[in-house]
Amino acid sequence: MTSKVDTGGWNKLENKLSDSTLNTINRLGFKSMSPVQSAVIPLFMSNKDVLVEACTGSGKTLAFVIPIIEKILKRETNLKKTDIASIIISPTRELAIQIQQVLLEFLNDLNRIDDQNDLENIKTLEDELLEEQEEEENEKEEEEIEKKKKKKKIEISSLLLIGGTDIYQDLVNYKNYGGNILIGTPGRTDEFLTRVVRNDQQFKFKEFEMLILDEADRLLDMGFHLPINSILLKLPKQRRTGLFSATQTSEVKELARTGMRNPFKVSVSVKHIETHEDQSIPTTLDNRYMIVPVEERLNQLVHFLLNHIDKNKIIIYFLTCSTVDYFFKILQSVKVLSGKPFFSLHGKAPHSQRIKVFDSFSQATNGCLLSTDLAARGLDIPNVDWVLQYDSPQDPKAFVHRIGRTARMGRDGNALIFLSPEEDSYIEFLKIKKVPLVEMVKAENVTNVLPEIKKISFNDREIMEKGVIAMVSHVRGYKEHLCPYIFVFHRLNIGLLATGFGLLYLPRMPEIRDKTLIAEWTSGYTKDQILKIAYKEKKKEKQRLEKVNKIKLKKEKDAKERQDAINEKKRKLEQQEADKLLQKQQPKQSSIEIQLKKQEEKKKQEQESINEILHETQAFKKARKSKQQKKDKSSRFSDLMGSDTEQNNNEDEEDEEEEDEDN
């Protein structure tokens, strides 16, 4: 069902908003509701589940923050500080922090108004008490007045649950300060709820009312299915659920079927004023493209920044974290941009640094933020005038989210994407996706900054290495495009790309297989010059030189060992050849020598046998002589001892003779 939404003032809502909420809305400068707010807030206030599809920058955050607060304010009984009434899940820490900041705008105003009302109520009640005491002494009325006087003000507490902090500290904060509204990322929120239930077996979500899944399509794209399902199982089924998304994917619809009951589908579309055609971007956004070869892209970027950075807030999107790091260094170093405010933001930076950069750029009146798609969704950076896409996003869905950082909530904005001539079919592809673009002709006679960039790299090895790493990551990221029929990898000119990056040499990588390109491509610097490039940081350069010297010594040692092995092998071969030659020259002499040697060995063996026989013969004769002497002595002794003894001696002699015979 399609209908036109009345985007009137906030006081036109059927369910009237509280004074504190209206005061905060007025203070923030929102004079009227956006289409998504006009459609969603009444449904939420009427206890309906909602499945919302709306373009980025349409005011989705207020569409769920306001109903959450109003539902708590309209409760008959006040919440305890540890009663969990609502949970808001976001895909990233940065978006969770931003939602928390918006929520605190309302909660802080609510507490200030309650403090003022308490003072006024006390005075009024005291006056009424005096008047009633003068009129009549009614005990029942006095008791009612005392109850009113003791009535507590409404306090709503919130708790931020994101990674990078200690989960035990979150539990302590919850116990001490409460958490009626939880805002967090899926993993940390699920872990927190698990520990709360584990620590208090009696804990139940008795007061729970609303669950919000912000950027639901991205939650599922990032693989948060398990923690989201775990959270859904913990929460009571009697609740209100809101799914907010820029696109309604099949996964989002499946999640809606499992986690919602008869949801109202809200789809807010935008029509172009002149063509009256539906489009996926705000009508206040001037969306453009520029056809520019990769080797000229950096020159066009510098020219663009010179004309816009002083008076505008600009976000430039790159394909990878490494390209953000490299171009952040390069743009700061170019003379014509010296002193200009540059910021960098990507997923590999520490969380504390990302928060600091985000806050600094948000508060700046002008400047340029270089980022990956980390800052493409959900983040509400105020007053962004230009979004420039130096590289096309891998996922075409990210295109709309990138340009959605400008032209938010009815403000004017501008967007520009660089495309090479080989990528021009992307324009028609986006048009089919209801994202129209108009051409912005590239500037002529722009300053060529590439020689200066090469010189910058030549003077600092760190920047040179960052450039090489950036190009490798860019090439591999380009290869993984989800629109490979538009961004065809084999049509990417690696040589011109390296020139456009201002590299001093081509990196070694499997993607570069063109041997002719490797042989012919040059930056104008020789290999010896590149090897001598030093780090500006002395400590780092000292370590590099030590490493180079160590590698050099190892190479020399390895070379010496290889040469020694070659020489030894050569010597052995020469010796073998010499032996063979010697055998050929004196074959007969060698034969005679061998025969003589054999004869000598034979004679030696025969002599040894003869000597052994002679030795045994001499030993035998000596033993026999000794026995004869013993026999003679025995004969003389037997004559003295008598015939018995003689007989025994005869027996002994017989035994000895037998032994001699045996021997």
Curated annotation (Swiss-Prot):
This is Probable ATP-dependent RNA helicase ddx55. Residues 556-663 are annotated as: Disordered. Residues 297-457 form the Helicase C-terminal domain. A motif (Q motif) lies at residues 10-38. Residues 556-582, 595-619 have a biased composition (Basic and acidic residues). It catalyses: ATP + H2O = ADP + phosphate + H(+). GO terms for biological process: rRNA processing. The keyword Glycoprotein does not apply. Belongs to the DEAD box helicase family. DDX55/SPB4 subfamily. It is found in: Nucleus, Nucleolus. Residues 531-658 form a coiled coil. Its main location: nucleus. PROSITE patterns: DEAD_ATP_HELICASE, HELICASE_ATP_BIND_1, HELICASE_CTER, Q_MOTIF. ATP binds at residues 54-61. Residues 583-594 have a biased composition (Low complexity). It comes from the Eukaryota. The Q motif is unique to and characteristic of the DEAD box family of RNA helicases and controls ATP binding and hydrolysis. The lineage of its organism: Eukaryota, Amoebozoa, Evosea, Eumycetozoa, Dictyostelia. One of its GO terms (cellular component) is nucleolus. Disulfide bonds: none annotated. Probable ATP-binding RNA helicase which may be involved in ribosome biogenesis. Keywords: ATP-binding, Coiled coil, Helicase, Hydrolase, Nucleotide-binding, Nucleus, Ribosome biogenesis, RNA-binding, rRNA processing. The keyword Chaperone does not apply. It holds the Pfam family DEAD. Its EC number is 3.6.4.13. Residues 649-663 have a biased composition (Acidic residues). One of its GO terms (molecular function) is ATP binding.
